[in-house]
Amino acid sequence: MIVRTLAEAEASDRRVTSENWESVRLLLKDDNMGFSFHITTIFEGADFEMHYKNHLESVFCMSGEGEVETLADGKVYPIKPGTIYILDKHDKHVLRATKEMKMACVFNPPVTGKEVHDESGAYPLEAEAIVD
């Protein structure tokens, strides 16, 4: 059994910060569960494009407000607490936060730990692993 607290993870290398977000990676590839689980904060005013070419992601909004736009068809979906969006087709998308958003995110395949978006908006398939 693996037991971790959010507070412990926030105070460790499992907390990864970028310009638009901060992600606390609670479950990673080395945990051998077949997916990774993150609590991610999207900063207020963030507006950025992503394209997970190597991963599928589902995102559940716990707090805050914003929107996600799928670039293939230009559809815009509001995000508020209780909303889930699922990037089941490696959807190229834009995420915008009108208020800081706290999100629960699941990635398949799992991330290794220190991934940040590359110039195309994707995470690499393999990155440096976090070692506890």
Curated annotation (Swiss-Prot):
Keywords: Lyase. One of its GO terms (molecular function) is ectoine synthase activity. Transmembrane segments: none annotated. The keyword Transcription does not apply. SUPFAM superfamilies: RmlC-like cupins. It catalyses: (2S)-4-acetamido-2-aminobutanoate = L-ectoine + H2O. The keyword Acetylation does not apply. GO terms for biological process: ectoine biosynthetic process. It is an enzyme of class 4 (lyase). Pfam families: Ectoine_synth. Pathway: Amine and polyamine biosynthesis; ectoine biosynthesis; L-ectoine from L-aspartate 4-semialdehyde: step 3/3. Its EC number is 4.2.1.108. InterPro entries: Ectoine_synth, RmlC-like_jellyroll, RmlC_Cupin_sf. It comes from the Bacteria. Catalyzes the circularization of gamma-N-acetyl-alpha,gamma-diaminobutyric acid (ADABA) to ectoine (1,4,5,6-tetrahydro-2-methyl-4-pyrimidine carboxylic acid), which is an excellent osmoprotectant. NCBIfam families: PRK13290.1. Belongs to the ectoine synthase family. This is L-ectoine synthase. It comes from Saccharophagus degradans (strain 2-40 / ATCC 43961 / DSM 17024).
